[in-house]
Amino acid sequence: MLDKVERMYATPPYPPFPRAEYTDRVRRLKEEMVKAELDVMVMWGENNIRYFTGFLTNHFPPVTVCPGVLIIAINKEPVMIVPNFFQGVVEGFTFINDIRVQHNPHVTENLRGMPREVAEVTKELMGSSKGRVGVEGGIKGGMTIPRPLNDIDEFRAALSEVEFVYAADQIWNVRMIKSLLEVEALSIACQADVKAYHDLIAEFEWGWTEKDVGLFVRKKLLDYADECLPNLCMSSRRKVFMADIPAWDEGIPLMPGDRLVLEPLPQVKGYWGSSGRTFHMGPAPEEEIHKIQILDRGRQVAAEMTKPGVTSGSIMDAINDTLEDGGLHCSLDQGGHGVGIDGQEPPAIALGETFEVQENMVLALECWMFETDDNGHHRVYGGEDYVHVTKDGCDLLPTFPTDIMTLGK
């Protein structure tokens, strides 16, 4: 049984964004719901709930409780359902007035009964047992409901007369368009990368391993940002090509002539920054510099053509054409993606995509080439930068200089 509780404070003492931002996000979602003829939207996902309300807890990865459910109806205030010990978290971070709490949420019977409780609130907000209910699923962006399948089956069974609609499109249509506050957070996060890179260039010493570099950058990021994940860091000395891994393995040396791919992952207010780079260890020969410059040119061309109305697939085509004109190739079918509080969001800048770029998106533009040298070493070239789409083009967010391409003297 859920209890509806009253707020202790009329306004949250620690909101991550102002009331006007909260109101605008919910308003835009309701507009999308009207277009899709949805009566109610039910969201279980951490980042969707965080985006629309500001609610944040470390308890989403474990599934030993259901940490939060957000329900939004067209003509009613949003409702948050949380374990009773998270009531203060809702009040501290969010402007939500309708808070429902579950008691003894760790008890298995109550945990497995939560979907039925959510269904009852859904019917209450619809004013009926029938209607169209949006859930986190669909083609765009790979959105999912992060609960056990049996919980979702129970939820659906309790709403047997409801028409469920995959509503990822409606959610992403709101989340893809960034406010000035979001762009600012992304910019600060990218600036953290730039600062950490400059620190690395200044302080790197021969004898460091791949892990030493990864830990150094991570420690620096924590001085400049709120949080960071383990950096993506891979040396060409690895015996097998291992993309997008953290630098946790011992004994991977960095030697003159090697290449190192590095992508720090700082977060500011939950928003991911990036300025992915590849470095030549020690002075780079002309052949290497030529490859690096062509990959950099690929990102530059992508930025030059990024503006509202351009399809994301055409940006990918331009990247491929630029690399091919330089005698190289793009090793991935993707040249970027949207960014926000998910590290990768729609739209995908990928082969054949027809999605049109829109003003106030923030996009990661990237191109990469992988090859194996005569010694069997796996060498990576390329990088990634962010752009903010404006009315007639785009602006680069803070980015590390492309003319600094070597690490170690």
Task: List each language-model region with its residue ranges.
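Active-site neighborhoods and metal-handling regions in enzymes and metal-associated proteins
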Residues: 1-409
